[in-house]
Amino acid sequence: MVSKSLIVLLLVSVLVSTFFTTEAYPASYDDDFDALDDLDGLDLDDLLDSEPADLVLLDMWANMLDSQDFEDFE
């Protein structure tokens, strides 16, 4: 019985912290393309210093931009 209460309490605390944190979701979607602007300033040294996860994100951005489904909302 105690373990069920503990699990429910943990779940509620995670949900509250997720949905009521001011930084959990962006206030507006106007800044969605700032990451694309940041990619313009990359040089070879930046790419060599990147972590593998950063390279995966760059690859995802490139695939999205090459995709036919991507629409520019600006």
From Swiss-Prot:
Keywords: Antibiotic, Antimicrobial, Secreted, Signal. May be an antimicrobial peptide. GO terms for biological process: defense response to bacterium. Expressed by the venom gland. Its main location: secreted. This is Anionic peptide clone 9. GO terms for cellular component: extracellular region. Residues 1-24 form the signal peptide. Belongs to the non-disulfide-bridged peptide (NDBP) superfamily. Long chain multifunctional peptide (group 2) family.
